[in-house]
A protein has these predicted regions:
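Recognition helix of helix-turn-helix DNA-binding domains
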Residues: 163-198
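Short amphipathic alpha-helix used as the core "switch/output" element in two-component signaling
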Residues: 38, 60-72
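The feature encodes the CheY-like receiver
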Residues: 10, 55, 83
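Acidic catalytic/metal-coordinating carboxylates
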Residues: 32-35, 56-61
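Basic, Lys/Arg-enriched C-terminal extension of HTH/homeodomain DNA-binding domains
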Residues: 188-217
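Active-site beta3 strand of CheY-like receiver
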Residues: 43-49
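Active-site residues of response regulator receiver
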Residues: 5, 51, 79
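Short, flexible helix-to-coil linker/hinge segments that flank and couple to helix-turn-helix
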Residues: 85-92, 96-97, 102-151, 155, ...
Length: 217
């Protein structure tokens, strides 16, 4: 993990919690976005925890540059309040999720592990709530991309937007989990989405998923 935040106390708190876990380690810290990009390129962390508001280079542009690395790390953006438009901008720039700075330690660790796993669920529940309240405007490009999906792929994408894991989707459709993984791979490829969160953003932009849609059915 790489911690990028201009507040040293925030970094120290996150480091203490993360380093207490046997499967997680903080490999570096940065106090501004530009240094965060440099360290991400040098250290190649699996996950970057990125503040949105920072000097020199803000977290949105830093996220865009970090996720352009090859291979790109996952990015979790930090925000001080739940429905932050900057958090949505960071997700559109490439972040996989966002996390409140005052999240409980167990929530933070669960979010980091979820994002690191990549294909577990779309992101912490706060991310879906953000998309519901600050739903991206309809985008004809997104509509055209979603139109290339098969009916089953659209059904899987809707299930992904509800935060379901591959196993939960497989159980719902009574198919093997490997079949769902194949569908997800096709969806990401057709939508040119980097990960599940980006695919879900496109689903909102195409109005395949709308704010207030149920998370279960």
């Amino acid at each position: 993990m790489l911690l990028v935040d201009d507040q040293s106390l925030v970094r120290a708190g996150f480091r203490m919690v993360i380093d207490s876990q046997p499967d997680l380690v903080v490999v570096g810290e940065a106090a501004d976005g530009l240094d965060g990009v440099r360290q991400a390129a040098a250290l190649r962390p699996d996950v970057v925890v990125m503040d949105v508001r920072m000097p020199v280079l803000d977290g949105i542009e830093a996220t865009r540059r970090v996720t352009a690395l090859d291979p790109p790390p996952k990015v979790v953006v930090l925000t001080t309040f739940d429905l932050d438009e900057n958090a949505l901008a960071a997700i559109r720039a490439g972040a996989s999720a966002f996390l409140l700075k005052d999240a409980r330690p167990e929530e933070m660790l669960a979010a980091l592990r979820t994002v690191h796993a990549g294909d577990a669920v779309i992101a912490p529940s706060t991310t879906r709530r953000l998309l519901d309240h600050l739903a991206p405007a309809r985008d004809p490009r997104a509509e055209r991309a979603v139109a290339t999906l098969t009916e089953r792929e659209r059904e899987v994408l809707v299930a992904m937007s509800r935060g379901w894991s591959n196993g939960e989707i497989a159980e719902r459709f009574v198919v093997a989990e490997g079949t769902i993984k194949t569908h997800v791979g096709h969806i990401l490829a057709k939508l040119e989405a980097r990960d599940r969160v980006q695919a879900v953003v496109i689903a909102y932009e195409a109005a395949l998923v709308r704010p207030g849609d149920p998370t279960t059915s």
